[in-house]
């Protein structure tokens, strides 16, 4: 019997049921008033949870029964480009058809456009399972943020024309941001957008590179709309459709995620429409897209980690050496235990992150539809916006680095067989490698998160969790996390007092790691408080991270500039 990737992973359901999504769902369902107009809308929070549980079980069944068995063939066949036309692998085409038939291509879109109106949290759980089945498919299924961006920032006419097509699976999307000379530095984008007044029409001209699913029917394009500008203030966001003037020059021959075409595009006077306001393409709309992309890739990475870990665990039980299964050897089982605990911590962080993203989006939506937004509404949107802005890069950094480590360990546990294509371990390793690069490298996630860390944005959340009614072992573990938090706070003050840009940049990674370790320690304790069976995992996570916290603290507060002063001499060796 095939696996159900939701029913066989109790941790996803545990997070769904214990996150505290009451306010998220209530606001998204307009105090459940949508039930008057849509028969499938929930009438209460319990009804909503039951609906999410059922749809996640359906996704889990599709992943286990259909998508996962095709993954090896998809990886082998890959996408191909012939004469400018991109063709997905046969298995990818079947996967997309299955997901469309299950009405899963407009998960977050409002019901009036044919969507499920599900929160980001539930959608991310789906993307995690899809990624566990086939990481490359997530790069197609997970691009639903394209439609969500049009929903949030487009005109009603644009919503009416585009969103029902996305929800029905008739249109797919891509975000065309990166250019040959503008990778992470999107302020350097040069693709031109010019407005023809006679035709009342925008046109796009230029090149884009490394565009995931660039062969899509609908593209969101970052382009320079203001003549003579060189920075982000001259960029706007446009939507265009695939046509004869939009050429796929080639697709990249990649290490992994072969089922997802990564395209080089040439725009030759492609008709386009402005999305939102001019000049806000980078500062407002791309930042929103990137926040969504961070969450999506975190889910993708977590799915790969789950797949790699399960595969390694299965092999360790089956493979015998020296007269016993290798799972019996401490060097093997300790690796598997450590990875499992880290996956649980990463999942706790990811879904705490999506909860804050959901609340930020809910308040943003409330403000946009309010005749006169109150000061309290704006305060709530700002507060959740700040926490989401720190949590999303921390989650991406943690989940993607973890995926690479778990996939690496999976091959190690397989030994020489893990290096062979006969086993999926090497595919997980190849697929994991891109996750901490695209949609912002881990180093850029540290840059994105460090401002919030220095401002102690997450302190109220940490304080709230530190004051939960822990007893016995959990109280002792909570005290250890509290001590780690004190070290973190002193490290932040030390770096702030140095007032040295180079030192600040050098220590950003360590501060991000400390923040993540402390926050995940509290999250693991909160989970253990709800389920006593999770005490052992919380204990292992906290005992493993305490020495790392201490090490980072000692390095940061040493004030040692030798790594800066001696860098040229070391690099010259």
Regions found by a protein language model. Name each.
Residues 344-396, 492-506, 525-529:
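C-terminal helix-coil-helix/basic helical segment that borders enzyme active sites and/or dimer interfaces
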Residues 456, 468-573:
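C-terminal amphipathic alpha-helical interaction region
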Residues 384-417:
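Charged, glycine-rich active-site and insertion segments that engage polyanionic ligands
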Residues 243-244, 254, 261-293, 310-327, ...:
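A glycine-rich, basic-preceded beta-loop-alpha segment at the flavin cofactor/substrate interface
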Residues 1-82, 86:
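Extended, charge-enriched "interface" segments that sit outside catalytic cores
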Residues 60-61, 90-164, 168, 212-214, ...:
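Internal helix-loop-helix
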Residues 201, 205-246:
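A short core secondary-structure module
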Residues 2-39, 145, 406, 416-479, ...:
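Glycine-rich phosphate/cofactor-binding loops in nucleotide/flavin-utilizing enzymes
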């Amino acid at each position: 019997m095939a696996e159900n990737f939701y029913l066989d992973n109790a941790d996803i359901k545990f997070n769904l049921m214990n996150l505290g999504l009451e306010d998220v769902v209530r606001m998204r369902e307009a105090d459940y008033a949508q039930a008057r107009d849509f028969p499938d809308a929930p009438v209460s929070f319990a009804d909503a949870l039951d609906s999410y549980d059922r749809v996640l079980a359906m996704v889990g069944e599709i992943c286990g029964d259909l998508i996962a068995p095709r993954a090896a063939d998809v990886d082998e066949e890959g996408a191909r480009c012939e004469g400018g036309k991109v063709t997905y692998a046969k298995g990818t085409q079947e996967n997309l058809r299955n997901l469309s038939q299950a009405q899963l291509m407009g998960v977050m879109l409002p019901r009036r456009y044919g969507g499920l109106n599900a929160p980001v949290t539930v959608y991310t759980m789906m993307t995690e399972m899809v990624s566990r089945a086939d990481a490359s498919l997530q790069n197609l299924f997970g691009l639903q943020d394209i439609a969500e961006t049009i929903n949030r920032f487009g005109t009603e006419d644009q919503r009416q024309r585009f969103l029902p097509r996305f929800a029905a699976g008739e249109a797919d999307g891509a975000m065309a941001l990166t250019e040959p000379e503008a990778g992470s530095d999107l302020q350097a984008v040069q693709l031109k957008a010019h407005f023809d007044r006679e035709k009342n029409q925008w046109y796009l001209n230029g090149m884009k590179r490394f565009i995931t699913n660039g062969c899509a029917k609908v593209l969101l394009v970052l382009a320079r709309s203001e003549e003579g500008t060189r920075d982000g203030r001259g960029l706007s966001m446009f939507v265009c459709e695939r046509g004869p003037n939009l050429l796929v020059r080639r697709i990249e021959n990649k290490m992994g995620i072969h089922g997802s075409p990564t395209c080089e595009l040439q725009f030759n006077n492609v008709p386009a429409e402005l999305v939102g306001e001019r000049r806000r393409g980078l500062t407002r709309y791309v930042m929103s897209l990137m926040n969504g992309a961070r969450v999506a890739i975190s889910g993708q990475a977590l799915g790969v980690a789950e797949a790699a870990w399960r595969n390694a665990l299965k092999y360790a039980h089956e493979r015998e050496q020296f007269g016993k299964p290798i799972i019996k050897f401490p060097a093997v089982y300790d690796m598997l235990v450590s990875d499992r605990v880290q996956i649980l911590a990463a999942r706790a962080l990811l879904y705490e992150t999506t909860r804050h993203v959901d609340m930020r989006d809910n308040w943003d939506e409330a403000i946009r539809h309010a005749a006169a937004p109150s000061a309290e509404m704006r305060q709530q949107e700002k507060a959740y916006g700040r926490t989401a802005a720190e949590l999303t890069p921390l989650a991406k950094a943690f989940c993607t680095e973890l995926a690479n480590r778990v996939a690496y360990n999976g091959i190690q546990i397989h030994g020489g067989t893990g290096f062979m294509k006969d086993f999926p371990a090497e595919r997980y390793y190849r697929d994991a490698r891109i996750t901490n690069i695209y949609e912002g490298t881990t180093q850029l996630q540290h840059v994105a998160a460090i401002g919030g860390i220095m401002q102690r944005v997450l302190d109220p959340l940490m304080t709230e969790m530190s004051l939960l009614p822990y007893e016995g072992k959990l109280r002792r573990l909570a005290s250890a996390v509290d001590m780690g938090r004190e070290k973190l706070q002193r490290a932040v003050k030390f770096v702030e007092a140095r007032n040295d840009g180079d030192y600040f940049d050098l220590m950003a990674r360590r501060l991000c790691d400390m923040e993540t370790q402390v926050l995940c320690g509290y999250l693991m304790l909160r989970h253990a408080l709800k389920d006593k069976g999770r005490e052992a995992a919380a204990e292992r996570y906290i005992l493993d991270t305490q020495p790392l916290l201490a090490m980072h603290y000692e390095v940061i507060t040493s004030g040692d500039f030798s790594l800066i002063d001696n860098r040229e001499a070391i690099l010259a060796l």
